[in-house]
Regions:
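Alpha-helical transmembrane segments in inner-membrane proteins
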Residues: 1-337
Length: 337
């Protein structure tokens, strides 16, 4: 227990360091003493520095923190519920559903959505469409979960929904303008920089609500690790638990995808890294460790995006596979061995 507590402490320290580096590093060099002062409310005479730290770097660091924790927790819950090491937030087509809605807005509706007297355009339209579509796919999966008792069948249904969405997106890309296709591809690369300071309270509240709900389900998750029959013998309502897990996962995935785009590999790889770190399947330790590790990995990926010296920014989905893919290959080879 002491060793695990030490690992958690080191992980928290690692997150704090990465969070600080995310506030320091960028295309514009802001000295550490001024960054520290700006964060605590002592703004400098340089308005550009104030704007960069408060309006740009702080929201981006908070977004990475929340997004990493949300996707990692979602991945762990799905892997446990379906006893599948390759289950992740995108496996049920939730990401694909959000991507389809964004494709419709960007490629078919010209970047705007009109509902009676309400007209949404630009980022607001994309945010609205992706969130609504992701939640719609979640409710479809939830409806199937009440009828389909077999986990494998439910996974296949989710994969098929993803294929259907991808097919429609391909058709939309074929008939779209070059500018529309370019805009959609940029959104699909993912970014932690799309959440403004004004949207941060809503984004963080939604993510924290989902994470708190996931922590409440620690005991049922522990029971599910030993199989559905064993869980039922302990008095766990497996169907109800699976429904709740899908609802929480859908909420977390919908929020993160709507604001950040379809971020790959974090939800798939981080739970495995957390298992290696903690050496346990007890979700009382594993779930908090997964959330913290997800926060750290997302902050690290966000930091790596700013490595180019010429001021350009690497897309987040160009970084996450470099970390996630080797982990998945290692896990699969270890299981095979």
């Amino acid at each position: 227990m002491r060793l695990t507590s030490l690992k958690i402490f080191v992980l928290v320290l690692f997150i704090l360091i990465l969070f600080g580096l995310n506030l320091l590093i960028g295309s514009v060099d802001v000295p550490f003493k001024y960054v520290r002062g700006i964060i605590v409310g002592n703004k400098t005479e340089n308005e550009l520095w104030n704007y960069i730290v408060i309006e740009n770097r702080l929201p981006q660091a908070l977004t990475a923190l929340c997004c990493g924790g949300a996707l990692s927790a979602s991945g762990l819950m799905l892997q446990t519920a379906f006893r599948n090491p390759l289950a992740g937030p995108g496996i049920f087509g939730i990401n694909s559903g959000a991507a389809l809605a964004v494709a419709v807005v960007m490629l078919f509706l010209g970047g705007s959505v009109s509902i009676e007297t309400v007209n949404l355009s630009g980022f607001t339209a994309i945010l609205f469409a992706s969130f609504v579509s992701a939640m719609a796919v979640t409710f479809i999966i939830l409806a199937f979960s009440t009828r389909v008792r077999n986990n494998v069948s439910l996974l296949i249904i989710g994969i098929m929904i993803g294929y259907l969405a991808s097919s429609v997106i391909s058709l939309l890309n074929f008939f779209a303008t070059d500018q529309g296709v370019k805009s959609y591809l940029i959104w699909g690369l993912g970014s932690f920089g799309g959440v403004s300071l004004g949207n941060i309270p809503f984004f963080c509240t939604m993510v924290l609500a989902g994470l708190v709900c996931s922590l409440v389900l620690v005991k049922p998750l522990n029971a599910l690790t030993l199989g559905e029959q064993y869980a039922q013998s302990l008095g766990v309502n497996v169907a109800r638990t699976r429904f709740l897990l899908l609802a929480i996962t859908g909420l977390l995935t919908a929020v993160t995808t709507a604001f950040c785009g379809p971020i790959a590999f974090i939800g798939l790889a981080v739970p495995h890294l957390a298992r290696l770190l903690t050496g346990t399947e007890d979700h009382r330790t594993l779930l908090p460790a997964t959330i913290l590790l997800g926060c750290g990995v997302a902050l690290l990926c966000s930091l790596l995006c700013y490595l180019p010296p010429n001021g350009s920014i690497i897309p987040i989905n160009a970084i996450t596979p470099l970390i996630g893919a080797p982990v998945i290959v290692y896990i699969m080879m270890k299981r095979r061995g």
